[in-house]
Curated annotation (Swiss-Prot):
This is Glutamate--tRNA ligase. ATP binds at residue 251. Catalyzes the attachment of glutamate to tRNA(Glu) in a two-step reaction: glutamate is first activated by ATP to form Glu-AMP and then transferred to the acceptor end of tRNA(Glu). Residues 122-146 have a biased composition (Basic and acidic residues).
Length: 480
């Protein structure tokens, strides 16, 4: 039998990896880390990365889940050279290989009823034997191929499957532990373990990076590959990700979908940096650009131990990237959050200026968008705590005075606005806070913002003056 290449298998490419999610849900952080490791290994070796959608579970696979996976991969910027390929579109190919295997005696039809199989299992369990098929139908000539049947792979009965896992080292499993795997169901559809084998063969996959939950599938898949005369890829099984409580990561630990992190205001660079460190490291280094990851990543450096997810560490990394990446780049991601929060940014400062103003204060872009709403939209109310603290009757005079000085300004910049506040404080013999804090609440609606000169320039002159007058009227109305 021969492989049927889906694309040009360049002989110069020595490493070809794949990410093969099942579209039964969103792209979760465990899957994203597997994709990242697979992608990095291919890039490190100037190889190719293939995306394959394993949608053989027809009942649970959905187009929405496929779209969510593709969206997550695109957001993380994990680009693929080939794909996405869908297993459901390759059933003819799988069945062609199965038919050839039957002809060559590598597989056989099994006509056993559910009742017979249940009786067999019960008998084996009573005799304290490992449940396995007894090859009752091997060499069966009594039944017609038209009768309902499954197809089983004729697994070797002697010897062992031995493979060198790139992460875990030598793994050996006795063939006596393995059953004659069903490779085609009664309805004619090929099974997961078989489709994976044919795909890896046809796609020339050299390295399979996947979760440790697949270790039990590997010896079965290796035996099928050997039967086909196909090359055996190198396997690397990475450990699971745990929550900070030591339990398997799940929804109760917070966001587990990649796109949920986007929605919560994280940058893809932060999530990638965090995920690569969940099981891999290079000395004590914490911050890795994608270029550094590609240069340094090796599967042999991946830990065998499970890693615990720490949201605080991810938040720290996110704040680092908000501060350190170019403001123009961060602003492109920030724009999505304004749109998501229904904030019209057409009338206000440039988004990259918002990033420069708030990068030190805000740890997420979601927080940054919410904290800068007042630059683009007027507000109907003031923060209650800020009103109680700063909107006393004594605030009316400095607000009126600073409004007068700001109104008279010919140029609206950092120097002139700061001077107006400073002069107001000096003339009224007040500390800067007695002028600046009521002014801050007046123009932002809250007691927190960047420095007042930066804030005023961002809001603009016309809006600033209207808001100060609104605050003066509000204080007077509260103290009638």
């Amino acid at each position: 039998m021969k492989a049927e290449a889906l694309f040009d298998l360049d002989p110069g490419v020595k490493v070809r990896t794949r990410f093969a999610p099942s579209p039964t849900g969103y792209l979760h952080v465990g899957g994203a880390r597997t994709a990242l490791y697979s992608w990095l290994y291919a890039k490190h070796h100037q190889g190719e990365f293939v995306l394959r959608i394993e949608d053989t579970d027809l009942e649970r696979s959905t187009p929405e889940a496929t779209a969510a996976i593709l969206e997550g991969m695109a957001w993380l910027n994990l680009a693929w050279e080939h794909g996405p390929y869908f297993q459901t579109k390759r059933f003819d190919r799988y069945n062609q290989v199965i038919d050839q295997m039957i002809e060559q005696g590598l597989a056989y039809r099994c006509y056993c009823s559910k009742e017979r199989l249940e009786d067999l299992r019960n008998t084996q369990e009573q005799n304290k034997q490992k449940p396995r098929y007894d090859r009752h139908c091997l060499g069966d000539h009594k039944h017609s191929p038209e009768q309902p049947h499954v197809v089983r792979f004729k697994n070797p009965t002697e010897g062992s499957v031995v493979f060198e896992d790139a992460v875990r080292g030598r793994i050996e499993i006795s063939n006596a532990e393995l059953d004659d795997l069903i490779i085609r169901r009664t309805d004619g559809s090929p099974t997961y373990n078989f489709c994976v084998v044919v795909d890896d063969w046809d796609m020339g996959i050299t390295h399979v990076v996947r979760g440790e939950d697949h270790i039990n599938n590997t010896p079965r898949q290796i035996n099928i590959l050997k039967a086909l005369g196909a090359p055996i890829p190198t396997y690397a099984h990475v450990s699971m990700i745990l929550g900070d409580d030591g339990q398997k990561l799940s929804k109760r630990h917070g966001a587990v979908s990649v796109m949920q992190y986007r929605d919560d205001g994280y940058l893809p660079e932060a999530l990638l940096n965090y995920l690569v460190r969940l099981g891999w490291g290079h000395g004590d280094q914490e911050i890795f650009s994608v270029e550094e990851m590609i240069k340094l990543f090796e599967l042999e450096s991946v830990s065998k131990s499970a890693s615990a997810f720490n949201t605080e560490k991810l938040l720290w990394l996110n704040h680092h990237y908000i501060r350190e990446l170019p403001a123009e780049y961060v602003a492109k991601h920030l724009a999505w959050h304004y749109q998501d929060q229904g904030i019209d940014t057409s009338n206000g400062p440039a988004l990259e200026d918002i990033v420069k103003m708030l990068a030190e204060r805000c740890k997420t872009l979601k927080e940054m968008a919410a904290a800068s709403r007042y630059f683009f939209e007027d507000f109907d109310s003031f923060d209650e705590a800020a009103v109680k603290k700063h909107f006393k009757v004594a605030a009316i005079e400095p607000l009126e005075k600073v409004k007068e000085k700001l109104t008279a300004l010919d140029s609206w910049d950092l120097h002139s606005t700061h001077q107006a506040i400073e002069q107001t404080a000096a003339e009224l013999e007040l500390g800067m806070g007695k002028v600046g804090m009521p002014l801050r609440v007046a123009v932002t609606g809250s007691g927190q913002s960047p420095s007042m000169d930066v804030t005023l320039v961002g809001i603009g002159k016309a809006r600033t003056l209207v808001r100060i007058q609104k605050a003066i009227d509000f204080i007077k109305s509260q103290n009638v």
